[in-house]
């Protein structure tokens, strides 16, 4: 598990599904078995819940980003003052208390978010953005895509993470919205849409081709 201290009151935790399996859990268990998911959360919290490192006491706020390769959990302590103000940027705790969970109930919030993620199809996780990510197993799967994606206005890069290749396509310079959707449809004929973000790939993945992925594949593989 990777631990990053964002500031005095906030930690960012990231754990891959491989790490989760090493702890004796499966992806299906943490998505659909509330008890197992809660137990995993407490295991993670126990590792950081020390006075010297990050003493979790009282209400905390959590934010979960669940991806196909792991979980990113941001934990923030909510220090509540006598007048109801907090030290984490919320001016009035009563107005924002739905964003917080007592330390002994936070597992329920985690599980509800994981369950929602587990019920979603990956294609439904695309957001309205210029950057799309696709995954595939063999580099040969990229060749027919590269042959059809000859538009120089489309930026592309290639990453590898845990035996999967990830194609990142930036449609920001595409001429029209319709053309963007058409190109996306072409790529989806051969590759699988992924909810993995470019930021996570840059942080944990291996960069294979930083620029002009389609042009490079056509030149050396097609």
From Swiss-Prot:
GO terms for biological process: negative regulation of establishment of competence for transformation; negative regulation of sporulation resulting in formation of a cellular spore. It comes from the Bacteria. GO terms for molecular function: protein-macromolecule adaptor activity. Gene3D superfamilies: 3.30.70.1950. Pfam families: MecA. Enables the recognition and targeting of unfolded and aggregated proteins to the ClpC protease or to other proteins involved in proteolysis. PANTHER family: ADAPTER PROTEIN MECA, ADAPTER PROTEIN MECA 2. Belongs to the MecA family. Homodimer. The N-terminal domain probably binds unfolded/aggregated proteins; the C-terminal domain interacts with ClpC. This is Adapter protein MecA. It comes from Lysinibacillus sphaericus (strain C3-41). The gene is mecA.
């Amino acid at each position: 598990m990777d631990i990053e201290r964002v500031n005095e009151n906030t930690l960012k935790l990231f754990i891959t599904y491989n790490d989760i399996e090493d702890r004796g859990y499966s992806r299906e268990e943490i998505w659909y078995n509330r008890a197992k998911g809660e137990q995993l959360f407490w295991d993670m919290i126990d590792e950081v819940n020390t006075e010297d490192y990050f003493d979790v006491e009282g209400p905390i706020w959590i934010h979960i980003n669940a991806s196909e390769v792991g979980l990113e959990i941001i934990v923030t302590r909510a220090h509540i003052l006598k007048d109801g103000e907090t030290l984490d940027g919320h001016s009035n705790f009563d107005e924002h208390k739905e964003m917080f969970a007592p330390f002994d109930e936070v597992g329920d919030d985690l599980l509800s978010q994981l369950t929602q993620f587990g019920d979603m199809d990956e294609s439904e996780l695309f957001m309205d953005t210029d950057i799309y990510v696709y995954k595939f197993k063999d580099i040969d799967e990229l060749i027919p895509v590269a042959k059809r994606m000859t538009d120089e206005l489309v930026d592309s890069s290639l990453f590898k993470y845990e035996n999967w290749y990830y194609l990142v396509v930036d449609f920001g310079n595409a001429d029209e919205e319709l053309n963007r959707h058409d190109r996306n449809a072409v790529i989806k004929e051969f590759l699988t849409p992924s909810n993995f973000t470019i930021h996570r790939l840059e942080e944990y993945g291996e960069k294979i081709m930083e620029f002009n992925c389609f042009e490079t594949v056509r030149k050396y593989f097609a």
